[in-house]
């Protein structure tokens, strides 16, 4: 294989491995890490990478969740999933309806809200005194679905919601992995229905599965020795990064 083809493939596999490990130990990050870096470096077409990420997320959950299902707050996950599924479609339709300037302004506002929430939570990483009601998980799912449909980023509202709960880290991780598995399943089925699961996607996903499985097992076996407070700070730090990444392109578009 020629170097100009091999290097992007190896780079993508390395990113998938790193993102999978991060998601296994925190419950999120695979899609955000891989999509963010690959789009910035141009390692592969965005549509192809998105389809590959959805497929390997299923492999990640298949290895990360066995033996840990008893830790999942099923009511919270169900409420979030119910909110996510229809709002993804709404997000896509809203983005198609809005003008480019309105969409840019909305992206700026969403980035500012996520950045503020991440900063506020990072400064006070202690969890809430008691679990939030199921309705708040539904609302976080709705906003997560809207973000996914409009900007391809569903994580921030869900990360903020689950990491503020008085849950053990393992409970938060497993719940988020399951929620994102539901989202990835829907995306994969929709991609298949649209005929987007072509040979390139299937080959790259097949190559990535062993990498994802190994990274998942490493995450389960050798998680970083972080305290719950540190883990929450890491999660909220990622939210800060996501908020900034949404704001900067929007600001650039307005300035230029």
UniProtKB/Swiss-Prot annotation:
PANTHER family: MEMBRANE TRANSPORTER PROTEIN (PTHR30269:SF37), TRANSMEMBRANE PROTEIN YFCA (PTHR30269). It is a multi-pass membrane protein. Could be a sulfite/organosulfonate exporter with a wide substrate range, including 3-sulfolactate and 3-sulfopyruvate. It is found in: Cell inner membrane. Pfam families: TauE. Belongs to the 4-toluene sulfonate uptake permease (TSUP) (TC 2.A.102) family. The keyword Transmembrane applies. The keyword Cell membrane applies. Keywords: Cell inner membrane, Cell membrane, Membrane, Transmembrane, Transmembrane helix, Transport. GO terms for cellular component: plasma membrane. The chain crosses the membrane at residues 5-25, 33-53, 76-96, 103-123, 142-162, 172-190, 199-219, 236-256. It comes from Cupriavidus necator (strain ATCC 17699 / DSM 428 / KCTC 22496 / NCIMB 10442 / H16 / Stanier 337) (Ralstonia eutropha). Induction: Induced by the C2 sulfonates taurine, isethionate and sulfoacetate. This is Probable sulfite/organosulfonate exporter TauE. Its main location: membrane.
